[in-house]
């Protein structure tokens, strides 16, 4: 066997007849499979042991030779070689075809490769191959045209006219084979290149296509006649097995049926040829043989598929590769693994962040070999067999051994669907009773898990390296930040938030207000004994917390705080300021001075002069975690998170918050608000009846009225709510629910959507406290159902989007430290109209500068060129008033097959500079795909007059951008740089004309009458600027402007969609994806290079081809950039393995075989398919074979000294 980790590339070509014979171990002559009485394979049949190898290890068919000692001997009685039975998965046979047969992939594929090679139409080919017409192969001296078709009748007439032997015409695949042998590749190519110089239109397109195929044959060394088969390979029998079922019947792979048909027809043809049967019978048999081989290779590609019992189409060789159940996606990219299990998950509130609870029964099964090894080592059992029995019996001693084995041995937990890399994390197992896996509550957010019956899978990493990677790279405590935006992903939720919210509340006049304590213990004692309340404002000596970063003016004073906040600050890391107010200033700059008593001040007076602070909410806790991570990194943060979780749970239990119907308030003026709305609607309808407004206007006015009524109720609800109301506390803290839920309970439900997505005019006036009427209940069911179906559709759509994104970017890996490019990207804040969707500060964080950034007023250099911009530096740059900065960007990176560290910036998941080997493409794809489910599915119909265009938003818009489709509601763009001089309206054609005066001439643009203008007369516009509202078509923009403009536009558009839904995604992820869409160019004029016009190729390959020509003084080729949608980009990748496993498997493989393509295994997918370690992370060549070295020589202490001390 080839060592899979040793070879560099993999090539696929057409198989020549001699190649097929060299693979084969013998000819299959009979259609029989196995003898139904003896159940032994038949000689010369499809399962013959002589050809394919023995069915039992080290045993020949007749039984003369048994055992391994006869290895390699061929039995003299039955002719079977004594070897392993697994050779039946590797050894191939062959069938000698009695007539040539065309390969359906090359004749039927689009475009037809045979047709292009011979310059014949696919229809003509079909007539010849299936014996409906003759084709002239050699006209000799007759006036017949070569390759012209003749019907049976015409053929006979011509024979009579010119005489026998005066010309050669044949039918069937044999004729095509003869024609293919006559093709002179070099001459044809030269002729076509000459023709291209003058051709245009359809003629040119056809010539380019033909040239492409002929050139592929010429360069790859494949011969065109190999597209016709004279010998058919038979795949190994264990890949098309036959299994006996319980009832004595057999279940066989469909391939066996298909092979049997081929063999039967081939044998019948051989017999007919021997008997010199009439030509028409032979022709018919040849046609049937051709159809049988077609069905074997790709059943159903031509005509009706061959069906098995119950009219089910049989699965051919092509079907074995295609689709989700095909070889690529079912067996090569996703395999089932051993040492795994799955169970329901339950919450484990007492676990540490890096632990998970594993049921004992599960653990003993998963770690069985490890336990057995220890049992033998401890001599509880003599051998492995006895140890296994001991484990299966459930001997008492195994549990102690199991405890030892799992110590320090991490396990992986995975929850499907794994939308991003945090869907698999490592934990240290803790043995528990019961049958459910226990999960730490804080990792739920990363997994998107809840405890309503979710299941999770558990895997055991076996090798030392796998364990080390699990512990160092995948441990849950390491994954504090979300790779998509660099924000903490482990923020506390629900009970934890509520507990900390309640704990940090302040209240005036509670028991114990104004007491002063010397330290925390005293405060807790007073609280426990009922002298002070958690919410009472009290004093505490600052000196009792000496490690906090106090200002000098604050030391040795008394600080006003609450008992709850003393407890809350006790769990904080010591170097963090004492948190008194829930804001960033307190967190970063320290506790405000107003809380400290000056000597001789009365504490009560100070307390009375202070406002009551709001408690710490979910968002504040997130900020605290982010700050902690920034300062102390993972270890301290995960320990702090555990303390925060415990404190939150403890106090939410203690607070005893409950919800009853009495907690839902009644709004006093609800009736008035609703009456006023009714009155307004009546007026609107009256105006409509009088013809003062259109139906569209009326609809908009009515829905607006009800929306305003609901908002008025909401506003009233917020004004009158009691901050101690449990529902308000849950809502305000961010633990559960929002104002919309609250207003449905206490205000009114409002307007509902009808099944067609249009909003119904009749609102639901009741709320859930009052209860809905039957009609209202019925109205509200529409929305509920739509919600359910939308979610289901959205999940599938979002998953497919993620799959396409991963496919297009899976080979983008950080390959080097610095690519040394001199290009950069000029960035400013992303705006949508007047609204800022993404600030400059956020865009700058974690990127490298391309040029130095200067203060706009003083001119001082804020940061030099090629420096990393930290959060603080980004804030400093923006505060200085800088509006645009040139940064290093993935767009402008010059690294081949990936990105360099400087162009990428920091790794958002760690907050440090990205490492070489990081699979940033996959991370980018997951970061964009994972929030896909949170985006809406709707295409908004903006009602009525406002505009007549539908604005696509949410997930459909993201798909539109990444697939580079023509957008809905397309904007008109200008091709001229200049000024808008006139906008004239033409009522007769219902259009407007916009005139733009440029330096070279005037641009005239016709826009629909109803389109909303983005420009006014006198505005200055650049090329590619939108004149009307709507989305710009990126392909059009690429024609008018340059690649970078398109990249910047696409980046901004993606960010607008996500940010408008409140989802934050790092720019760099979008940059990685967009760069992949623009990595190809189309050759326009080949110049002196040997490139073909119209060829699609990588920018880097194109540059290389030109470089050589320029050096030798020739004319370089010209090209234009091409924008491809992600599906197309995935299929155009350099790796045929990756493309074939994505979509259109047969087309990709057909093309790759003709070109003799080489896959250099640069991406992740290709390596997974062939079972090689992926070239990312620790699998990169530079990280393999690293020997650990001590940093400095370790001093060895003399043993005698140690022993002397010990005495």
From Swiss-Prot:
Keyword annotations: DNA-directed RNA polymerase, Magnesium, Metal-binding, Nucleotidyltransferase, Transcription, Transferase, Zinc
Pfam families, alphabetized: RNA_pol_Rpb1_1 (PF04997), RNA_pol_Rpb1_2 (PF00623), RNA_pol_Rpb1_3 (PF04983), RNA_pol_Rpb1_4 (PF05000), RNA_pol_Rpb1_5 (PF04998)
Gene3D superfamilies documented for this protein: 1.10.132.30, 1.10.150.390, 1.10.1790.20, 1.10.40.90, 2.40.40.20, 2.40.50.100, RNA polymerase II, clamp domain, RNA polymerase Rpb1, domain 3
Cofactor(s) demanded: Mg(2+); Zn(2+)
Enzyme Commission number: 2.7.7.6
Cofactor note: Binds 1 Mg(2+) ion per subunit. Binds 2 Zn(2+) ions per subunit.
GO cellular component annotations of the record: DNA-directed RNA polymerase complex
Domain of life: Bacteria
GO molecular function: DNA binding; DNA-directed RNA polymerase activity; magnesium ion binding; zinc ion binding
InterPro entries: DNA-dir_RpoC_beta_prime, DNA-dir_RpoC_beta_prime_bact, RNA_pol_asu, RNA_pol_N, RNA_pol_Rpb1_1, RNA_pol_Rpb1_3, RNA_pol_Rpb1_3_sf, RNA_pol_Rpb1_4
Amino acids binding Zn(2+) 1: 60, 62, 75, 78
Binding residue positions for Mg(2+): 450, 452, 454
Catalytic activity: RNA(n) + a ribonucleoside 5'-triphosphate = RNA(n+1) + diphosphate
UniProt: Zn(2+) 2 binding residues: 819, 893, 900, 903
GO process annotations (BP): DNA-templated transcription
General function of this protein: DNA-dependent RNA polymerase catalyzes the transcription of DNA into RNA using the four ribonucleoside triphosphates as substrates.
Family listed: Belongs to the RNA polymerase beta' chain family.
Subunit field text: The RNAP catalytic core consists of 2 alpha, 1 beta, 1 beta' and 1 omega subunit. When a sigma factor is associated with the core the holoenzyme is formed, which can initiate transcription.
Designated name of the protein: DNA-directed RNA polymerase subunit beta'
Organism field: Streptococcus pyogenes serotype M3 (strain SSI-1)
């Amino acid at each position: 066997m080839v060592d899979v980790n040793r070879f560099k590339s993999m090539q696929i070509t057409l198989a020549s007849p001699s190649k097929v014979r060299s693979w084969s171990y013998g000819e299959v002559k009979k259609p029989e499979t196995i003898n139904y009485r003896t159940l032994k394979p038949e000689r010369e049949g499809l399962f013959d042991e002589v050809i394919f190898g023995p069915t039992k290890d080290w045993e020949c068919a007749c039984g003369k030779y048994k055992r391994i000692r006869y290895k390699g001997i061929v039995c003299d009685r039955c002719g079977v070689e004594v070897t392993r039975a697994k050779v039946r998965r590797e050894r191939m046979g062959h069938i000698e075809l009695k007539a040539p047969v065309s390969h359906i992939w090359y004749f039927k594929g689009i475009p037809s490769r045979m047709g292009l090679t011979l310059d014949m139409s696919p229809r003509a080919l079909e007539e010849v191959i299936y014996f409906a017409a003759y084709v002239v192969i050699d006209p000799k001296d007759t006036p017949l045209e070569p390759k012209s078709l003749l019907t049976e009748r015409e053929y006979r007439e011509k024979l009579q006219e010119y005489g026998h032997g005066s010309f050669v015409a044949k039918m069937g695949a044999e004729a095509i084979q003869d024609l293919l042998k006559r093709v002179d590749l070099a001459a044809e190519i030269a002729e076509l290149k000459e023709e291209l110089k003058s051709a245009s239109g359809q003629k040119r397109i056809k010539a380019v296509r033909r040239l492409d195929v002929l050139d592929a044959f010429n360069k790859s060394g494949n011969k065109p006649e190999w597209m016709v088969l004279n010998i058919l390979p038979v795949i190994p029998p264990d890949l098309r097995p036959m299994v006996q079922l319980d009832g004595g019947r057999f279940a066989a792979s469909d391939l066996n049926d298909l092979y049997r048909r081929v063999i039967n027809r081939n044998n019948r043809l051989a017999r007919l040829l021997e008997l010199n049967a009439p030509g028409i019978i032979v022709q018919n048999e040849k046609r049937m043989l051709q159809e049988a081989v077609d069905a074997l290779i790709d059943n159903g590609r031509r005509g009706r598929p061959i069906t098995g019992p119950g009219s089910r189409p049989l699965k051919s060789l092509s079907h074995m590769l295609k689709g989700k159940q095909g070889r690529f996606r079912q067996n090569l990219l996703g395999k089932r693994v051993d040492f795994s299990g799955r169970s329901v998950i339950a919450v484990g509130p007492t676990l540490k962040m890096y632990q998970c609870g594993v049921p004992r029964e599960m653990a003993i099964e998963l770690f069985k070999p490890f336990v057995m090894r220890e049992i033998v080592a401890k001599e509880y059992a003599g051998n492995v067999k006895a140890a296994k029995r001991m484990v299966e019996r459930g001997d008492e001693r195994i549990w102690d051994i199991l405890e030892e084995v799992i110590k320090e041995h991490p396990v992986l937990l995975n929850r499907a669907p794994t939308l991003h890399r945090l869907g698999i994390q490592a934990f240290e197992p803790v043995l528990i009773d019961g049958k459910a896996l226990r999960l730490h509550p804080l990792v739920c957010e990363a997994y998107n898990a809840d405890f309503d019956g979710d299941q999770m899978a558990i895997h055991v990493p076996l090798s030392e390296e796998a364990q080390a990677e699990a512990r160092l790279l995948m441990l849950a405590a390491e994954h504090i930040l979300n790779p998509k935006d660099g924000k903490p992903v482990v923020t506390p939720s629900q009970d934890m938030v509520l507990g900390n919210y309640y704990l940090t509340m302040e209240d005036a006049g509670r028991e114990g207000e104004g007491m002063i304590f010397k330290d925390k213990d005293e405060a807790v004692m007073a609280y426990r004994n009922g002298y002070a309340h958690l919410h009472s404002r009290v004093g505490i000596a600052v000196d009792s917390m000496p490690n906090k970063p106090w200002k000098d003016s604050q030391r040795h004073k008394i600080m006003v705080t609450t008992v709850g906040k003393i407890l809350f600050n006790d769990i904080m890391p010591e170097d963090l300021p004492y948190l008194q107010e829930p804001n960033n200033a307190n967190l970063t700059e320290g506790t405000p001075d107003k809380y400290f008593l000056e000597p001789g001040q009365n504490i009560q007076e100070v307390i009375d002069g202070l406002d009551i602070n709001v408690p710490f909410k979910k968002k504040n806790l997130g900020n605290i975690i982010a700050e902690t991570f920034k300062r102390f990194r993972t270890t301290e943060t995960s320990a702090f998170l555990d303390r925060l979780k415990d404190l939150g749970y403890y106090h939410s239990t203690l607070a005893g918050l409950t919800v009853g119907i009495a907690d839902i308030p009644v709004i006093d003026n609800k009736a008035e608000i609703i009456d006023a709305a009714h009155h307004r609607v009546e007026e609107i309808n009256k105006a409509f009846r009088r013809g003062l407004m259109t139906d569209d206007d009326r609809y908009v006015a009515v829905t607006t009225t009800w929306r305003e009524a609901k908002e008025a109720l909401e506003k009233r609800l917020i004004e009158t709510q009691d901050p101690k109301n449990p529902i308000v506390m849950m809502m305000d803290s961010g633990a559960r629910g929002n104002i919309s839920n609250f207003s449905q309970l206490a205000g009114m439900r409002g307007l509902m959507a009808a099944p067609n997505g249009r909003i119904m005019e009749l609102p639901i006036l009741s709320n859930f406290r009052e209860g809905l009427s039957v009609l209202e209940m019925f109205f509200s069911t529409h929305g509920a159902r739509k919600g359910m179906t939308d979610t289901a559709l959205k999940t599938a759509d979002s998953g497919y989007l993620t799959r396409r994104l991963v496919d297009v970017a899976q080979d983008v890996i950080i390959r080097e430290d610095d690519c040394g490019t001199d290009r950069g990207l000029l960035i400013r804040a992303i705006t949508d109209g007047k609204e800022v969707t993404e600030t400059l500060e956020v865009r700058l964080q974690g990127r490298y500068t391309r040029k130095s950034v200067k203060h706009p007023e003083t001119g001082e250099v804020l940061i030099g060129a090629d420096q990393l911009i930290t959060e603080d530096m980004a804030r400093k740059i923006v505060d200085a008033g800088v509006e645009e900065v040139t940064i290093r960007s993935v767009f402008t990176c010059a690294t081949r097959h990936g990105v360099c560290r400087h162009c990428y910036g920091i790794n958002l998941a760690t907050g440090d500079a990205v490492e070489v080997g990081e699979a940033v493409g996959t991370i980018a794809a997951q970061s964009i795909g994972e929030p896909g489910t949170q985006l809406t599915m709707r295409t908004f119909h903006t009602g009525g007059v406002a505009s007549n265009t539908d604005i696509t938003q949410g997930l459909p818009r993201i798909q539109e951008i990444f697939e580079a489709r023509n957008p809905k509601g397309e904007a008109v763009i200008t091709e001229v740089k200049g000024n808008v001089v006139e906008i004239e309206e033409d009522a007769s054609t219902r259009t407007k004309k916009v005139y733009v005066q440029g330096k070279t001439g005037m641009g005239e643009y016709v826009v629909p009458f109803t389109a909303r203008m983005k420009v006014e007369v006198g505005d200055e516009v650049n090329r590619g600027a939108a004149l009307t509202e709507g989305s710009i078509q990126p392909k059009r923009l690429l024609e008018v402007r340059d690649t970078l403009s398109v990249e910047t536009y696409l980046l901004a558009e993606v960010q607008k969609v996500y940010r408008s839904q409140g989802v934050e995604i790092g720019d760099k992820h979008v940059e990685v994806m967009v760069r992949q869409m623009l990595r190809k160019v189309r050759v326009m004029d080949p110049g002196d290079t040997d490139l073909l016009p119209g060829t699609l190729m990588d920018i880097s390959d194109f540059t290389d081809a030109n470089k050589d020509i320029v050096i030798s003084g020739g004319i370089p080729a010209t090209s234009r950039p091409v924008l491809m949608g992600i599906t197309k980009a995935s299929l155009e990748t350099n790796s045929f393995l990756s493309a074939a496993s994505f979509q259109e498997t047969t087309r990709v493989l057909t093309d790759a075989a003709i070109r003799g393509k080489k896959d250099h295994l640069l991406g992740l997918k290709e390596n997974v398919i062939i079972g090689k370690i992926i070239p990312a992370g620790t699998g990169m060549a530079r990280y393999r074979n690293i020997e650990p070295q001590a940093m400095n020589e370790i001093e060895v202490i003399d043993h005698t000294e140690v022993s002397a001390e010990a005495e």
